[in-house]
């Protein structure tokens, strides 16, 4: 469905090199990315600002021409076959609109039907399904400029799907949305993914979107893929530092040390302690605490995905710094 082989994109910029002199510098926005995404997959594509996410999406949709490497989407080459590709993909950018600002949603959808030459029966069936899942009926006849951000985003999703795309690219689809609107969008995308009819590629900084929707996670940093696998594999590789939180009847003895763990917090005059588990299992840590003090309550806190991804970014940049020094 989507194939990338050693895909790269560089940009030439001019940087100040003196009072009156500027020199050219080549920046690799995407650097040798190779990925294969199958039909019906829901893939999260994440990274810090400037990592190359949006540049990759623009190459996949035919907006940018790769500097080197190969890319195909739905068996088509995005740039030379951009018109044909547009009929087979849908794109939603959280900060850009494909709707007509002064027209009601219903009229925007009719125009898109004409643009994509969708048969009337297919158009109505898809629109009805989107209306049911996204609750559009209450604002179909309101001009887009008068819609709330959440309503407009639901309209954007519908507009991207009315021509029956095989691949849906989503760039920050929940940015700026309130809790209720986010939940509506996530529920809709989850239902869409369960059917397996559409391949979904999602880029976002809201990692809750990724955790709830995507089965596969690709992390990119400095233009290179640093992780490609399941969220569980990411946790296993970078999320081993669980925390043990214990409520005690009395403080731990002075100088207490838990081998393989670091005390990272103490509250309530020592009656609540937090340990970060490094090279000790939760079971062994619990046994040591129970031996040392009267324990009233215990909980093991798994690192959430934001902590795990932050650690991945930090480790990657530390490694890059060491490489540069060497």
What do the predicted segments below correspond to?
Residues 110, 114, 122-139:
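Conserved ABC ATPase "signature" region
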Residues 168-172:
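Catalytic Walker B motif of ABC-type/P-loop ATPase nucleotide-binding domains
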Residues 164:
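Conserved catalytic motifs of ABC-family nucleotide-binding domains
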Residues 69-77, 85-86:
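Conserved ABC transporter NBD signature motif
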Residues 186-276:
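ABC transporter nucleotide-binding domain
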